[in-house]
């Protein structure tokens, strides 16, 4: 993710050899409503600041061009939810031989996009086994995380498929509608905490 531009400068003192430097003027963030501000962490501020760079002025002239570039990894902006914005303002300062300065501000506007939540689980937590006549229940859990810090994911469940085999392990066994409904109804999940962007969901399979 990048953008770039340039500014030009000139000094009427023909023997001056101006130099360019940069400084961060301000960095602010707003929620998607466009008016509610929120704080950025030190790491986020560092990433947003370090993304701005300028070229070096050629030293043998009293006038010239300074190119600026803003380049940041998409992963460094994952904390922004859809339509949240960051406004980063930087100063490019031209300084001559007599320490006289001229300043040009560069404003970079960044708009967030929605990032999908990520699910993680070990194999023993996403597979269950029960045997008729003994244990008739099993359980496990999965974890989830959403990089959009103000997102509040919810969880739902549905049945992808139900299949049955005879004792030989290969011959399909037809289930009645009631049997299939009972098998599906035995699966349930917990409700995740709605006050966080990450957490865990417990699942249970229990059949009579």
Q: What would you call each of these model-derived segments?
A:
Residues 2, 101-105, 114, 137:
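Short edge beta-strand segments in beta-sheet-rich domains
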Residues 70, 114-121:
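Proline-centered linker/hinge motifs at extracellular inter-domain junctions
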Residues 1-48, 118-183:
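Extracellular ectodomain surface segments
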Residues 33-110, 133, 171-208:
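Acidic, turn/loop-rich segments in luminal/extracellular domains of secretory-pathway
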């Amino acid at each position: 993710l990048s953008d770039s531009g340039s500014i030009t400068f000139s000094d009427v003192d023909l023997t001056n050899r101006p130099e360019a430097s940069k400084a961060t003027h301000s960095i602010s963030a707003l929620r998607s409503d466009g008016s509610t501000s929120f704080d950025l962490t030190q790491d986020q501020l560092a990433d947003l600041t370090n993304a701005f760079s300028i070229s070096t002025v050629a030293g043998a002239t009293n006038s010239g061009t300074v190119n600026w570039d803003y380049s940041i990894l998409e992963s460094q902006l994952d904390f922004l939810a859809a339509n949240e914005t960051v406004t980063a303002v930087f100063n490019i300062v031209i300084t001559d031989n007599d320490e006289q300065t001229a300043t040009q501000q560069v404003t970079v506007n960044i708009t967030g996009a929605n990032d999908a939540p990520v699910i993680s689980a070990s194999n023993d937590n996403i597979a269950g086994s029960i045997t008729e006549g003994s244990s008739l229940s099993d359980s496990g859990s999965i974890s989830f995380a959403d990089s959009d810090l103000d997102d509040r994911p919810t969880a739902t469940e549905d049945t992808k498929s139900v299949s049955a085999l005879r004792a030989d392990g290969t011959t399909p066994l037809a289930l009645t509608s009631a049997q299939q409904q009972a098998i599906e109804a035995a699966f349930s999940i917990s409700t995740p905490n709605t006050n966080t962007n990450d957490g865990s969901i417990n699942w249970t399979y229990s059949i009579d």
